[in-house]
Amino acid sequence: MSMSDTLGDMLTRIRNGQSANKAVVEAPASRFRGNVLDVLKREGYIRNFSKFEKRPGIHEFKIELKYFEGKPVISEIKRLSTPGRRVYSSIKNLQKTYNGLGISILSTPRGVMSDNEARAAHVGGEVLCQVF
């Protein structure tokens, strides 16, 4: 049976890995999930990620989680737009996450970006998740 929400699965793996104080978690690879991980890395929520071949033709990401003074950098990671309920926002209606302390990750016509980058580029789109 195929998985319906692959991004939600990856975010849950990150959340569970940080709850268990893991240094590294693995998640199935795709270009879209790689773009989301790139935003998380740029914003400083994960240390790094790399793609590797688990079996011939099967690629996965190795995600290095980030901690500060023994505590996870990500306090909360929440999926907003799901396959059953899409959430879209124009740039005017895009709310700041936790008064600007967190970020929202958006899928826009110009690619996957954080809410700050979307405001600078003046584009709205699908609100994928919030990270705090």
Model region roles, listed by residue range:
Residues 1-132:
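Core subunits and conserved enzymes of cellular information-processing
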